[in-house]
Amino acid sequence: MGGINGYEIGNLSSFDIKANDNTLFADIKNKHNTMNSSSAESLFQKLSKYADNYKESKCYWVQILAKNSFNEKWFGEINGKEYSHSRVYKISGDQFYKLLSGNENALFELYKILPEAILDYLKNQESENFQNNSALEEIKLSSKKSNRNILNEITFENYSYYLGFDKLE
């Protein structure tokens, strides 16, 4: 995402990605349920601080493996305290790719080119490196049972409800 024009990754800073003009700050997490309440409170306070310090900014908690597609203000109760800020949001991975790229199906289009990139990568690796990878073996077995390729097997388990992914056959 940091390769998208106008954005940079936050190498060892307190944000994961931001707009070059400081109008967007984001903290990226794989799943919403990987954070406990104190982590959520800390993240909300961090994003609120960016929003307060940069008056034109919007700040996002990005959930890459969210259960739905969404882009909404983040408000709620954490540790018995109510939290809200007019420019602090939570957003799913597909919506965040859309926001940064301006392309509604950006994550889906990235997905579509992954098979070629993965094949190129695998061709350059020694096969013995993958023989000891039990996770890869489990995915291979599962994909054979479902008659899907490996990438589709992984994707259908995680992204079937995201923007554009309903177009997969």
Regions found by a protein language model. Name each.
Residues 11-20, 63:
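Short, surface-exposed recognition loops or helix-turn segments adjacent to catalytic cores
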Residues 4-5, 17-19, 50-54:
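Alpha-helix C-terminal capping segments
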Residues 31-93:
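Catalytic cores of nucleic-acid endonucleases
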Residues 1-11:
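Acidic-basic catalytic patches of nuclease active cores, encompassing PD-(D/E)XK
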Residues 13, 22-24, 55-58:
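Generic structural motif recognizing short loop/turn segments at the entrances and edges of beta-strands
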Residues 17-35:
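Conserved catalytic cores of phosphodiester-cleaving nucleases, focusing on short active-site segments
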Residues 76-169:
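Charged, structured surface patches that assemble and position nucleic-acid processing machinery
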